[in-house]
Each structure stands twice: as structure tokens, then as C-alpha cells.
Amino acid sequence: MMEKLIITAAICGAEVTKEHNPAVPYTVEEIAREAESAYKAGASIIHLHVREDDGTPTQDKERFRKCIEAIREKCPDVIIQPSTGGAVGMTDLERLQPTELHPEMATLDCGTCNFGGDEIFVNTENTIKNFGKILIERGVKPEIEVFDKGMIDYAIRYQKQGFIQKPMHFDFVLGVQMSASARDLVFMSESIPEGSTWTVAGVGRHQFQMAALAIVMGGHVRVGFEDNVYIDKGILAKSNGELVERVVRLAKELGREIATPDEARQILSLKK
């Protein structure tokens, strides 16, 4: 029998704006409301970027604190997973600020990626090792974000060097640097160490295709406005909750139960 399905909601990201979808949250209140919509629909993890009220991405620790407190009021047991990716161009010190709050999880990007145009999301070897070391020191479990197979190899190397601890949890972000096909997902899932867990974030039109594949393959799923603002072709999603609801329906139709936050903690070996 497969593990229950962990659904992560990436509710706002750093790149998508209200011009893409008016429901994208910026303010503390909007972020908390979107987190609640995803949580009530079945998400057990909130992947969190935060914004200033005008939509500018920020890694400010106090802004994260306010957003986390507001989310906790509405979703007391949800797992909150701050991003250490921040936004393109931020310094390492800026990106690490939310980990000072000692969340249960945070992301760890294991390589550099072209984001389109002149944007390069830079993660040098020294950056990755430093982030890994600090996450261990602060008791934060990394979700290892990988955009292609080479980043899995980097993560395995850094684990052997002591900068990442087992069991490892990966997030395959497909449809950016690497294509998003069934073959790609099988290849990625078979390339990680035994005993690891994984989730997939299909970007744009790939979101629900990748979700369906992950459900039947025994992986987990990330959806949300960060990766996709449409519920169907040409139809904007009204909320992150609507995106989560679609994954829940898929899972039920395919015979996969949904994990609660505490069940997700057990699957991911988290310490609450």
C-alpha cells in the first residue's frame, strides 16, 4: 500500500504577480487567507515566499514572522516551509533570514538555473554547502530543490560530505530547466538514494500532468500559484485552494489517501 499523499501548496512565489492572476497574495492577510484555503482543501505543507504590500519579494525575517504567525492562527498544525531561494539577485545572507525562525523545513536549491531572459538563479557550491550546514545547525529539514538530474548528483555528493543529512527529501521542479514528461519523472525518481522521499512541482501546463503521475508512482505533489495560476486551460484559478482541490480529486479517483500534517511529519521524519 502506498504512503498517503503529501500535498504542498506554493502559494505565491517570488516571480508571479497580480497581473498574472489577481488572486496572487501580497499582504500578510492575503498570504494567510491563501494558506488557509490550501490547508482546508488538503495541503499539509505551505511552501512560503513573502512579499511587501506592493508585491516586492522580500526575505526579511520579521515579514516572515508576521506571515507565519498569521498562518498559524488559521492553520495551527500545518507544516510551514520557507523558501531560501528568495528572489533572483538576493544575497546569501538575505536568503537565509527566515531560517533564523527555526521552521520545521526550508528549501535547499542544489544548483544554478537559467530562469529566462537575463535571469540566473545562482547557487554556487560554497552557497549550497553553507546553506546545508546552517540548516543542520538550526534543526531545519531541507527540501532539496532540483531542476535537473545533475542537481541530484550534487545533493548526493554534499550528503556524503556531511552538508545534508539522511533521509533526504527532494522536490523535482520540472518544466523550467528540464522538460516535464513521464520519462523525465521516472528518471529523476529512480536517481535518488534509497530511503529518500520526493515530490514534484510541474510548472505551468505541466502541473496536473505531473501531479497525476506522482500520485500513481508513490511520490508527492506540489501545486500553487508559484508554479501555475490556471485551474484549466485559459481559466484562472480563484485560489490556491482550488488547485489543491483538483489534486485531492485526482488522488481519490486513483485510490490514494491524503496525508494530514502530522502524517506528513511522520513520512518526512520531521520533529515537530
From Swiss-Prot:
Optimum pH is 6.5-7.0. The half-maximal rate is observed at pH 5.2 and 8.1. Signal peptide: none annotated. Zn(2+) binds at residues 47, 49, 226. Its cofactor is Zn(2+). It is an enzyme of class 2 (transferase). The keyword Zinc applies. InterPro entries: Aldolase_TIM (IPR013785), BKACE (IPR008567). Keywords: Metal-binding, Transferase, Zinc. Belongs to the BKACE family. Kce subfamily. The keyword Transferase applies. It comes from the Bacteria. One of its GO terms (molecular function) is metal ion binding. Homotetramer. 3-fold increase in activity by addition of 10 mM 2-mercaptoethanol. Addition of CoCl(2) and to a lesser extent MnCl(2) increases the activity but not MgCl(2). Inhibited by phosphate buffer but not by 5,5'-dithio-2-nitrobenzoic acid. Pathway: Amino-acid degradation; L-lysine degradation via acetate pathway. This is 3-keto-5-aminohexanoate cleavage enzyme. Gene3D superfamilies: Aldolase class I. (5S)-5-amino-3-oxohexanoate binds at residues 15, 83, 86, 107. One of its GO terms (biological process) is L-lysine catabolic process to acetate. It catalyses: (5S)-5-amino-3-oxohexanoate + acetyl-CoA = (3S)-3-aminobutanoyl-CoA + acetoacetate. Involved in the anaerobic fermentation of lysine. Catalyzes the reversible reaction between 3-keto-5-aminohexanoate (KAH) and acetyl-CoA to form 3-aminobutyryl-CoA and acetoacetate. The reaction involves the deprotonation of KAH, the nucleophilic addition onto acetyl-CoA and the intramolecular transfer of the CoA moiety. It can also use beta-alanyl-CoA as substrate. Its EC number is 2.3.1.247. It holds the Pfam family BKACE. It comes from Fusobacterium nucleatum subsp. nucleatum (strain ATCC 25586 / DSM 15643 / BCRC 10681 / CIP 101130 / JCM 8532 / KCTC 2640 / LMG 13131 / VPI 4355).
